[in-house]
């Protein structure tokens, strides 16, 4: 195994990806990828939620439109606003400052969990705390990223904020 072997594998992987896309993926999977890359391809279908989400976040501006005053959230243009797109509702109704504060609070929580992982007395406590920090970080990045159109829509809840009993209960445990 040399460095040349790694390069060969990387080149084969790069060549394989387009081949997989064109010859292996079913049409609905291709559509999901295409709409993720450009939501305007299907603005009333697969791209609808992300376009409405971005519009909601952008219309909130710095201070927001006020609680229960957001046009996208209150008029029903943003459907799963209490679960998948809760961050869009926060951005529209409460504005950039509160939306940024939500991110800061998550980063504080994750930083504290990493601190606990570093100062734990045994390996098990360290692994559990680091794992919890990783889960919160993943959920935060995935949910906020999908509401901004940076990541594909997956349905991952925003911890402690999204509506849903099982997710909230799991986060508290």
Which residues fall in each region the model found?
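Loop-to-helix entry and N-terminal half of a specific, functionally important transmembrane alpha helix
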Residues: 116-154, 161
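Short aromatic-rich membrane-water interface segments that cap or initiate transmembrane helices
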Residues: 39, 156-166
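Hydrophobic, glycine- and aromatic-enriched re-entrant/interface helices and adjoining loop segments
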Residues: 11-100, 121-125
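Transmembrane helix-bundle signature of multi-pass membrane transporters/permeases
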Residues: 77, 89-92, 132-136, 164-167
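Short, small-residue-biased leader/transition segments that mark boundaries at the very start
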Residues: 2-7
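Transmembrane alpha-helices of multi-pass, membrane-embedded glycan-processing enzymes
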Residues: 102-109
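Hydrophobic alpha-helical transmembrane segments of membrane transport and translocation systems
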Residues: 148, 165-173
